[in-house]
Amino acid sequence: KDAGIPVITVDRMVDVSDDSLYESYVGGNFLLEGQKAAEWLKAYADAKGITELNIAHIQGTIGASAQIGRTQGLEEAAEKYGWNIVAQQTGEFTQAKGQEVMESMLKQHDNINVVYCENDNEAFGAIDAIKAAGKTVGPDGDILVISFDTVKAGIEMTLTGDIICNVECN
């Protein structure tokens, strides 16, 4: 600021008391992403006659703007529609932690039918854990997997049905 160099934040918002420290933010509306994913889940569940949703929520890194918005979108919908968030833990936006967390959740809750992962890496790990536990994913499977970011491998897993809904960050 003192040097007169404009700062533009990309992909993550910053929480500062002086908004004049940066000129602009370029990135996704993470709350809207969470709301859109929840709207999709509601419509899908209604169309398929799924009356009870027991959701395992694998959060991103706690405090990250993507985690805050995507979590808020899910929690608002869960309250509005009476969905059960049976487990909630950070996967730190990584595949390894996503797998570890999903393994733990599956051991503690045998009624999970949706996993809401706040990015694709977490979803990849969660899917590995689900399959290792002898359960299936996809539209005809035991557990529906929702994800965000649609990286190349995420798109491929959405096309195969392993990820049932993948929300793009743009």
Regions found by a protein language model. Name each.
Residues 1-170:
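A residue-level marker of the well-folded mature domains of exported/periplasmic proteins
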